[in-house]
A protein has these predicted regions:
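Non-catalytic surface loops within mature trypsin-like serine protease
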Residues: 18, 120, 157-159
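Residues forming well-ordered secondary-structure scaffolds
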Residues: 85, 89, 110-111, 148, ...
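Active-site cores enriched in adjacent His and Asp/Glu residues with nearby glycine-rich loops
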Residues: 103-121
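N-terminal auxiliary "cap/dimerization" subdomain that precedes the catalytic jelly-roll/cupin core
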Residues: 1-107
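Catalytic core of non-heme Fe(II) oxygenases with the double-stranded beta-helix
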Residues: 125-183
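Pocket-edge structural micro-motifs
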Residues: 16, 118-120, 170
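N-terminal accessory scaffold of Fe(II)-dependent oxygenases
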Residues: 81-90, 113-119, 126
Length: 183
């Protein structure tokens, strides 16, 4: 059972996996959105980006202003992709563990949000500083209804072993960390 690991120690679980066919489809859904968006913002560079692919995007990212062209709103998968993901067996496994669930609409787009990140190697501005997601919720970005529990699912799409940019501090969710908002 993954719930004791998530709610207690260490605060996360890596017990759930995605079947290779579904993982490939998830990559395709993200790639299609990535490629489609690049066609709108940098049509003159699409060929170069396609040569690199999303997994080597960083090799051509100098051609655009990465920091300004990839806000979260353009990385939220379209409804048809979310509907397809909802039918995947790994989502069924999540429902087996947690019961039926909603995927949150944190940015008020009017539907369930599944989004992806695009982080380049050795680019410190592509990642946020160490933080607790609950801080954002405490400050009013997204809400969790009283009768709900929030569970965050992170899936590495293109990751080099040992070089993953995602860091989780075990048991950090059990502590009250001091913080302050910076506007």
């Amino acid at each position: 059972m993954i719930q004791p690991k998530i709610n207690g120690s260490p605060g996360f679980s890596t017990d759930l996996s995605i079947e290779s066919v579904e993982f490939a489809r998830l990559r395709d859904l993200i790639y299609d959105q990535w490629q489609g968006y690049l066609k709108t913002i940098a049509p003159e560079h699409v060929k170069r980006f396609e040569e690199c692919g999303i997994e080597r995007y960083h090799e051509a990212s100098y051609l655009i202003d990465h920091g300004s062209v990839w806000p979260k709103k353009v990385r939220i998968l379209p409804q048809n992709a979310v509907s397809e993901i909802r039918k995947m067996s790994f989502v069924n496994k999540l429902e087996d563990y947690f019961g039926s669930f909603e995927i949150s609409d944190e940015d008020n787009v009017g539907r369930e949000e599944i989004y992806w990140r695009l982080v380049r190697p050795n680019e410190k501005n592509d990642v946020n500083p160490l933080h607790a997601d609950a801080w954002f919720w405490d400050l009013g970005h997204g809400t969790t209804p009283n009768n709900m529990v929030r569970v965050k699912v992170w899936i590495g799409i293109y990751v080099e072993p040992g070089l993953n940019g995602f860091v989780y501090v075990p048991e950090s969710h059990l502590k009250n960390w001091p913080y302050h908002a910076v506007l």
